């Protein structure tokens, strides 16, 4: 839903309504080509429920944004009428700028009059680019040098919480696995040269981390810097080799994935570089957190994602978009090993919290059976609630809001929320500022 779909009638009514305890948000959708098509997409179904816009079966619906970022701003809806003319809509960012008390003083002192997190739902049917997000210092540098490509100066740590079975590439495999990759995938040596490739066999587990990382950095940078023509030829030969080998043996999961990526991005360097990364499969309810400067690529599935409020992405493979190979290869940490999978911890019988090691955000997941209730205690910062399935009600001390799938609600600081399920199961997610941040003040 672009900005041209919103009627903005000024801030006066928003200022008058700034004291409301719960406000509905109208949210923004991104139609990237890797998104699921039409009604197959969870994002499409949420958009239809949230905005009333009909789903087009020919269009990919990739991301559902909830927040204040200028690349996809949410709007606050005021007015009780049923027609567009009866309502006033302003951006969530304008509203919190006019009413900083909604954020709480601790949040304003730390991040100013803005939401420090960005909340999303992703529906993925085709692999996203091999990418990483910059830390704060690099984000400031990139934004200063190329503000059209890097739209803000913020870092972007994030968490991805699986709603359906979810697959991703994330982080570099172990040193032992990298040695097996160089041995078993001769096409890598073709692209980087034997002098570089053989260096992986001259480092060992007991060597200093920096020595190991420097070798991995060298090989990976050489690989990602290969010429397009050479890459296309080598990736094609690798595909043909793997297809031939299927007649004699069962391919590994990674090899099968690489063949699938080759169908999606024929001749792309990201196809062969996938061998360097951990192949992660998340079950619903499991989560993956991604720090700055860690390589990753989502492969398929639906997830809820939360991050620091940024849209900065450095890409280098599996994409038709701009690639910044030099920046990506120089920024990565080259930390080796399988990433930590978060399963969350229970707050109540119905609520699970996911608490990554970042100040800006945490995510709660609530599965509430019919007739059951739970309480989200008041916190010193703002929250955004998303109903992803079912229906129920949210209550404060003075108001009640009936909610259904696709409803997104902004709750100001210091408001306790009581939730009751009114369907077989109501599934909702809450994003808020990390409770660790408030505990350390």
Swiss-Prot record:
GO molecular function: mannose-6-phosphate isomerase activity; zinc ion binding
Tissue: Not expressed in any organs under light (at protein level).
Notes on temperature effects: Optimum temperature is 48 degrees Celsius.
Catalytic activity: D-mannose 6-phosphate = D-fructose 6-phosphate
EC assignment: 5.3.1.8
Cofactor binding notes: Binds 1 zinc ion per subunit.
Record has Transferase as a keyword: no
Residues that bind Zn(2+): 131, 133, 158, 296
One Pfam family this sequence matches: PMI_typeI_hel
The protein's annotated pathway: Nucleotide-sugar biosynthesis; GDP-alpha-D-mannose biosynthesis; alpha-D-mannose 1-phosphate from D-fructose 6-phosphate: step 1/2
Induction conditions: By sugar starvation, by dark and by 3-O-methyl-Glc (3-OMG). Down-regulated by sugars. Up-regulated by DCMU, an exogenous photosynthesis inhibitor.
InterPro entries: Man6P_Isoase-1, Mannose-6-P_Isomerase, Pmannose_isomerase-type1_CS, PMI_typeI_C, PMI_typeI_cat, PMI_typeI_hel, RmlC-like_jellyroll, RmlC_Cupin_sf
Catalytic-site annotation from UniProt: 315
Enzyme class, spelled out: isomerase
Record-linked PANTHER family: MANNOSE-6-PHOSPHATE ISOMERASE (PTHR10309:SF0)
The protein's name in its UniProt record: Mannose-6-phosphate isomerase 2
Taxonomic source organism: Arabidopsis thaliana
């Amino acid at each position: 839903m672009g900005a041209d779909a919103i009627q903005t009638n000024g801030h006066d009514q928003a200022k008058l309504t700034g004291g409301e305890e719960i406000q509905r948000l109208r949210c923004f959708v991104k139609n990237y080509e890797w998104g699921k098509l039409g009604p197959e997409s969870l994002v499409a179904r949420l958009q239809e429920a949230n905005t009333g816009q009909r789903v087009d079966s020919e269009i990919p619906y990739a991301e559902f944004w909830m927040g204040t970022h200028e690349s996809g701003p949410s709007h606050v809806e005021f007015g009780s009428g049923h027609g567009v003319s009866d309502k006033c809509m302003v951006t969530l960012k304008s509203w919190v700028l006019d009413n900083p008390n909604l954020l709480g003083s601790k949040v304003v002192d730390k991040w100013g009059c803005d939401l420090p997190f960005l909340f999303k739902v992703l529906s993925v049917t085709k692999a996203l680019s091999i990418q990483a997000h910059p830390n704060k210092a690099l984000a400031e540098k990139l934004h200063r040098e190329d503000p059209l490509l890097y739209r803000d100066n913020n870092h972007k740590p994030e968490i991805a919480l699986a709603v359906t079975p979810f697959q991703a590439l994330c982080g570099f495999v172990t040193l032992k696995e990298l040695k097996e990759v160089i041995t078993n995938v001769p096409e890598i040596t073709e692209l980087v040269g034997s002098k570089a490739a053989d260096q992986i066999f001259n480092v060992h587990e007991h060597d200093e981390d920096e020595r190991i990382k420097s070798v991995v950095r060298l090989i990976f940078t050489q690989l990602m810097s290969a010429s397009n023509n050479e890459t296309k030829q080598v990736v094609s030969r690798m595909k043909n080799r793997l297809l031939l080998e299927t007649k004699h043996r069962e391919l590994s999961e990674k090899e099968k994935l690489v063949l699938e990526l080759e169908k999606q991005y024929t001749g792309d360097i990201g196809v062969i570089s996938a061998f360097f990364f951990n192949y992660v499969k998340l079950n619903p309810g499991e989560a993956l957190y991604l720090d700055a400067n860690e390589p990753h690529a989502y492969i398929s599935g639906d997830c809820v994602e939360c991050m620091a409020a940024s849209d900065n992405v450095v890409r280098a493979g599996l994409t038709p978009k701009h690639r910044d190979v030099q920046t990506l290869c120089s920024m990565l940490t080259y930390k080796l090993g399988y990433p930590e999978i978060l399963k969350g911890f229970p707050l109540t019988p119905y609520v699970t919290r996911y608490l990554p090691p970042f100040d800006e955000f945490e995510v709660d997941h609530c599965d509430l059976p019919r007739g059951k209730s739970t309480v989200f205690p008041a916190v010193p910062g703002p929250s955004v609630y998303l109903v992803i399935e079912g229906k129920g009600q949210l209550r404060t001390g003075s108001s009640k809001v009936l909610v259904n799938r696709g409803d997104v609600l902004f709750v100001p600081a210091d408001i306790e929320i009581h939730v009751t399920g009114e369907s077989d199961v109501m599934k909702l997610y809450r994003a808020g500022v990390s409770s660790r941040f408030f505990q350390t003040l």
